[in-house]
Amino acid sequence: MANASPLSPTNQHFFQPLLPGFQSNLKIPVNYFSEHIEGKHEGKTVTLRTDASERTWEVKMEGHRLTEGWKEFVEAHDLRIGDFVVFRHEGDMVFHVTALGPSCCEIQYPQSSRHEEGEESGENEISEKEGEENVQKESDKSSSDLNCFSQSVTHSNISRDAVSVPRDFVKRSGFSKGRHEIVLMNEEGKSWESEVKSYMSGAVYLVGGWTTFCTENKLDVGDSCTFKLLQKAKTPVFQLCSRTKHLPLSFTKVNGLINPGKIILVDKDRAEWSMMLKVDSRGAVYIIGGNDWKSFCAANEVGAGESLALELIQGGVLLNQITTCFQMEQPSFKAEDGRHKRARVQNRSQETDKGAETSRASTMGPKLEITEKGEPSRASTMRPKVEIREKIAETGEPSRASNKSSGIEGNLQHTKPCSVKTDQLAKVKESVVDTLTSIGRFQAELETMKRKLEDSLQELN
């Protein structure tokens, strides 16, 4: 059977779209049934298997319909209206079933606990352990306990409104069996109803509310989010861990960053990212950027665990709203471990007269050094027209501060307003073209599907 040719009778295929009512039974196409099953097999049951688990399902066949046992197969694989199933006959009434989502892409299920003999099994187990260790490391970064798990947003889990839950988290938290109502909660306390559901294949999914949660919290495909389990409430709560960036309190007080407002991050190429300053009830100031912060770090090669020095040039305050501009600049030397980054933070005054430049330069504050934890190490009063720089060393040790030269002052006075690069427009244009191409491809797939459904309808008539 393993050596059968793809064109041999034992490898004949048929597929069916899942329409309303499919949960109770599934029809085998008349032509396929008459050519490959009718009169050639005495058995009244078929065996179904998938790549989702080692288990097989015995399903009763009444005429050319799959009936008793089909519902259990559907529930085990979370099949839904709009999905497609492809059956490959492997001989002796054994069918391998592949499930496709509405996007016509194969549905991916978490690997089950398969313990086959031989070298291949060993490799699978190692790979699985490594995956669990990676998830554990991500959790450790976000919380001091083990009640966290991380997951990425994908096209598949968005379209299916369901996302898999890591196996190690499931074991720790007791969600490995049955169905459990839960609540998804964002950083601001807004909640969405959902549930954790386990399947016979061993897979555990967070089902319902996922797509809405991602949309309203501006989580895009490729983003990673970490949830912390709060079990004190009657219904378990999966709370999204903070994606904000905390600014040291000593730094914000000295520089008057005490009010919420809009900020714009600009790198050396003057590409812009819009962020917000948020002040909590304790007076702590955060940068909230979500995907924009992630894009900013990626564009400037700032990775997880790396230090980032911020350099603030004090500016004017307008309507109690501070508008700042972070300008990334490449250091003139390469750090010992290659991981130190520097950024310049420049306030943009909204005045348009020529005196704005002079006003901005004359309000420069003292130079402040802080450790990685945000604790002040040494501060000294400097002459006017110098920058306030926040340096964070990778090792957490305080760095030494020095006066900026007059050449730097000259550069500050000639800083140009933040602007969007032309290459960004090119990227937008390219994205639109790609979207139109995808739409055309999808329309072609719909036409093919339409013809097949019309053929099926003719068979029914």
Curated annotation (Swiss-Prot):
Comp. bias intervals (Polar residues): 400-415
Family annotation (InterPro entries): B3_DNA-bd, DNA-bd_pseudobarrel_sf, REM_fam
Residue range(s) of DNA binding per entry: 11-103, 148-244, 230-332
Membrane-traversing stretches: none
GO molecular function terms listed in the Swiss-Prot or TrEMBL record: transcription cis-regulatory region binding
One Pfam family per UniProt: B3
Compositionally biased intervals (Basic and acidic residues): 126-143, 384-394
Alphabetic keyword roster: DNA-binding, Nucleus, Repeat, Transcription, Transcription regulation
Record flagged with keyword DNA-binding: yes
The keyword DNA-binding appears for this protein: yes
GO cellular component, one term: chloroplast envelope
Broad class of the protein's primary localization: nucleus
GO biological process: response to cold
Signal peptide, first to last residue: none
Gene3D superfamilies, alphabetized: DNA-binding pseudobarrel domain (2.40.330.10)
UniProt cross-references to PROSITE patterns, sorted A to Z: B3
Localization annotation: Nucleus
Protein name per the record: B3 domain-containing protein REM9
